[in-house]
A protein has these predicted regions:
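Anion-binding alpha/beta catalytic cores of soluble intermediary-metabolism enzymes, centered on
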Residues: 2-271, 276-351
Length: 351
């Protein structure tokens, strides 16, 4: 992530961390062999933003002393009792789909699967990983062990883009979705993605979502199968979430710039005011967030995974310690607002 000009992102990031620190949540980190993660854990613990839990990596024993020196709770995934619980969960979830006991033990020792087992059991409130493991790895473990939230059929992701002011005097915080998971969403999936993004925006940013379903067309200015897809998604979305402020199809400028929105979609309550941008494909979303990050020097916080039963966030593999801290704060807010079980800080122990 390229840093935004300090005044652009500092207010939102400071508020994000302060809100998380008000009710610290237990967040587990399975990638402690990476120095960036250990650095982030130190800051998170020192500033009491979250209550970190560190997983030892059996494949990197040379890092264990450094992990234990962090002064936070440390868990060894190879300890018999803890491993057995994770293996039982894996077999319960996947045995009918061909997972053997031997393979379940192998997965159970893996820090990522072990950490998500802790999330599923309620031992911790959320998991942050992805600066070492791929998005596919992170999602596989999360779907196997945590699973989707009740009634959710589409797991997706969002970035929170903090940009310089362009509609007033204050920095903008925009939700970009989906930028990391669903490659070619159907109309139903686009509607699910929009609902998940709107729900998380309320939890994380604390304002009311105004959702623009993006296209190369604005309310009939263009035609084609991709435009039809977005229009169908809007119809489905309005039926599923009738109180949500949503419109589409809208072009990017019509969604964001009041003067353009008034000209291209004069009857829209969303045009020119959107704060949630739903892209029609992973190509569009991923390209857009990277361009805005690099050219506009926006802060890109995420990707934040949406739609899981409990929070599990996926970092960029280029994440800095600050990125990890910010995603951990968002993960904690997801857990707090979703009503995850309260935990008291556990002290400095190892299991």
């Amino acid at each position: 992530m390229i840093a935004a000009p300090p005044m652009v992102s500092s207010t939102f990031v400071d508020l994000l961390r302060a809100r998380a620190a008000a009710h610290p949540r237990r967040i587990v980190f399975p990638e402690t062999a990476d120095l960036r993660v250990r650095t982030a854990i130190e800051t998170l613990a020192r500033e009491r933003i979250v209550d970190p839990v560190a997983i030892l990596d059996p494949a990197a024993p040379e890092t264990h002393s450094a992990v234990r020196a962090l002064g936070v709770e440390v868990v060894d995934p190879t300890v018999e009792g803890a491993l057995g619980r994770t293996v039982d969960m894996l077999l319960s979830a996947r045995a009918k789909k061909g997972l053997s006991p031997e393979k379940a033990i192998e997965y159970g020792r893996h820090p990522l699967f072990f950490a998500d087992g802790m999330v599923k059991r309620g031992d911790v409130d959320g998991c942050v990983s992805g600066c070492v493991y791929t998005t596919a790895d992170v999602l596989r473990a999360a779907i196997w062990l945590i699973g989707p939230a009740h009634g959710v059929r589409t797991i997706s992701s969002a970035f929170y883009m903090v940009t310089a002011p362009f509609r007033g005097d204050t920095a903008e915080v925009l939700t970009f979705t989906d930028c990391a998971v669903v490659q070619y969403p159907t109309a139903e999936q686009l509607a699910d993605i929009a609902i998940a993004a709107a729900t998380d925006r309320r939890r994380i940013v604390g304002d009311e979502p105004s959702v623009a379903m993006l296209s190369f067309s604005s309310v009939g200015s263009g035609s084609g199968s991709s435009v039809d897809l977005v229009r169908n998604a809007v119809s489905i979305l309005r039926a599923k979430a009738p109180t949500l402020a949503v419109d589409g199809e809208l072009q990017g400028d019509a969604a964001l710039i009041p003067a353009v929105g008034n000209r291209k979609a004069p009857r829209s309550s969303v045009a020119g005011r959107a704060n949630v941008l739903v892209f029609p494909s992973l190509d569009a979303g991923n390209i857009a967030y990277k361009l805005v990050e690099r050219i506009a020097r926006a802060s890109a916080i995420g990707p934040i995974v949406q739609g899981l039963a409990r929070p599990c966030s996926d970092l960029s593999r280029g994440a800095s310690p600050d990125d990890i801290i910010n995603v951990a704060a968002i993960t904690a807010l997801q857990a707090a607002q979703a009503g995850a079980t309260e935990h008291q800080p556990s002290g400095r122990t190892e299991t």
